UniProtKB/Swiss-Prot annotation:
Protein name per Swiss-Prot or TrEMBL: NAD(P)H-quinone oxidoreductase subunit 2 A, chloroplastic
Oligomer and partners: NDH is composed of at least 16 different subunits, 5 of which are encoded in the nucleus.
Signal sequence, start to end: none
Keyword terms of this UniProt record: Chloroplast, Membrane, NAD, NADP, Plastid, Plastoquinone, Quinone, Thylakoid, Translocase, Transmembrane, Transmembrane helix, Transport
Organism: Psilotum nudum (Whisk fern)
Recorded coiled-coil stretches: none
Role noted for this protein: NDH shuttles electrons from NAD(P)H:plastoquinone, via FMN and iron-sulfur (Fe-S) centers, to quinones in the photosynthetic chain and possibly in a chloroplast respiratory chain. The immediate electron acceptor for the enzyme in this species is believed to be plastoquinone. Couples the redox reaction to proton translocation, and thus conserves the redox energy in a proton gradient.
Keyword presence, Thylakoid: yes
Length: 496
């Protein structure tokens, strides 16, 4: 009976991940057993979306379960880990409808795309709950390799191939640095691989305050800095964003950030909890550099995707305020709250530029001039998402930033919050510049695609899958502003 009970506990702990594994096998089987002209894409999309929806429901049903360590203490179930797993599932669930029309227009294979998306989601979910160094590395590489393949998904596009190579080379280098950082506390602790066991081993060996642990912390910070696109580890981000397919950029612009934030928070909270003074300063410097350079360089961009790349760099700088503030001042709760809102703001913006790009074939910001005349619904959605990203009241982004900055201020991060407020004003400038272009200027060098542009209906009924994602994300970027208190209460319930 004890073995059966243990099996049920273990299997239920990774049941959402198991559903994604079985759905991936099902999608691959459909592709292998069906003829090319049978039109199996409907079933592939349906299986993937159903698997993600079921996984979300299971996670919600498991919300009140007690924290538990399973699989020889290599995987941890807790509310904090579950909220990040939930974020990853939401991202994937919204990104798949975003890609349907894009894949149909570019005539790219569906099965490979869905497999890479589900595999990346699977790796990110395992990374959120991984409790030992081996599981952390394997899960992070599963997420990273799937992201590399997604960035080079359009093989016939030279820019996509270039983006994949840059992402692969930089990602491989960062993974090597991260593994080297893991190797130092592993050796100094006497061969421990579990996170808390490693801390106990370092204390017992009287090596916790040694130079080796400080060096390991620096290497781990560099490795995570790449995954979060923090300045100065951000060089790959604009090129990869510009060269990769837009739905792919939408996907890993949020999933990689969510998984890396979960990993960073757990490492700093568990492994380096007594060294907060040592890692606070470098993390503050990275946050300041990311906020300043990300927003300043975004002002000069002419490509919408490159602008969003630098915008995402600055947004992560804001989110780091929550990690630095820590648990005592609701820093983690503010980070979770803003991350949830950021997912919808970012995906909503990418849904708008995906729809515009498919209809016009351009990504240049100046080609958006006068869009409101052709497509008022797309214009309204883009305006609301950009204003929410800038933190304009009463949209959700304003309340998310307000809570994040307030928690940072209470934690004594006065200079960091002041920089965040100043750079937020800069971000409002380049967001409002795009909004002004949408309403006031006309594009004289209009393309043939823009001449035949068919706008969405004037009523809020989307006529394609991109429109569904766009409307949902726009609503989620707006409505939570008046429902921020319940969201904050849920976030405060997810702490360690």
């Amino acid at each position: 009976m004890k073995e059966i009970e243990s099996f049920l506990v273990y299997s239920s702990s990774i049941l959402p991940e198991c559903i994604l594994i079985f759905s991936s096998i099902g999608i691959l089987s459909i592709d292998l057993l069906s003829l090319p002209n049978e039109g199996d894409t409907f079933w592939s999309y349906s299986i993937s979306l159903a698997a993600l929806a079921i996984s979300i429901i299971i996670l919600l049903l498991q919300w009140n379960k007690e924290p538990v360590l399973t699989f020889s203490e290599t995987f941890q179930i807790s509310r904090f880990n579950d909220i990040f797993r939930f974020f990853l599932l939401i991202c994937s669930f919204l990104c798949i409808p975003l890609s349907v029309d894009y894949i149909r227009c570019t005539k790219m294979p569906v099965t490979e795309f869905l497999l890479f998306v589900l595999t990346a989601t699977l790796g990110g979910m395992f990374l959120c709950g991984a409790n030992d160094l081996i599981s952390i590395f394997v899960a992070s590489e599963c997420l990273a390799l799937s992201s590399y393949l997604l960035s080079g998904y359009t093989k016939r596009d030279v820019r996509s191939n270039e983006a994949m190579m840059k992402y692969l080379l930089m990602g491989g280098a960062s993974s090597s640095i991260l593994v080297y950082g893991f190797s130092l506390p592993y050796g100094l602790s006497g061969g421990e691989i579990q996170l808390r066991g490693m801390v106990n081993g370092l204390i017992n060996m009287q090596m916790y305050n040694s130079a080796g642990v400080s060096i390991a912390m620096i290497f781990i910070l560099v490795g995570i800095g790449f995954k979060l696109s923090l300045v100065p580890f951000h060089q790959w981000t604009p090129d990869v964003y510009e060269g990769s397919p837009t739905p792919v950029v939408a996907f890993f612009s949020v999933t990689s950030k969510v998984a890396a934030l979960a990993l960073a928070t757990r490492l700093f909270h568990i492994l380096f909890s007594s060294l907060s003074n040592e890692w606070h300063l470098p993390l503050e410097i990275l946050a300041i550099l990311s906020m300043i350079l990300g927003n300043l360089i975004a002002v000069t961009q002419t490509s919408m995707k490159r602008m969003l790349a630098y915008s995402s760099i600055s947004q992560i700088g804001y989110i780091l305020i929550g990690i630095i503030a820590g648990d005592s001042d609701n820093g983690y709760a503010s980070m979770i709250t803003y991350m949830l809102i950021y997912i919808f703001m970012n995906l909503g913006t990418f849904a708008c530029i995906t729809s515009f790009g498919l209809r016009t074939g351009t990504d240049n910001i100046r080609d958006y001039a006068g869009l409101y005349r052709k497509d008022p619904i797309l214009t309204l959605s883009l305006v609301l998402c950009l204003l929410s990203l800038g933190g304009i009241p009463p949209l959700a982004g304003f309340f998310g930033k307000l809570y994040l900055f307030w928690c940072g201020w209470k934690a004594g991060l006065y200079f960091l919050v002041s920089i965040a407020l100043f750079t937020s004003v800069i971000s409002i400038y380049y967001y409002s510049r795009i909004i002004k272009l949408l309403f006031t200027e006309r594009n004289k060098r209009i393309t043939i695609y823009m001449q035949d542009y068919k706008g969405s209906p004037y009523f809020l009924i989307p006529n394609n899958s991109i429109g569904i994602t766009m409307i949902l994300c726009t609503i989620a970027s707006t409505v939570p502003g008046i429902l921020i208190n319940p969201i904050i209460a849920i976030a405060q319930n997810t702490l360690f």
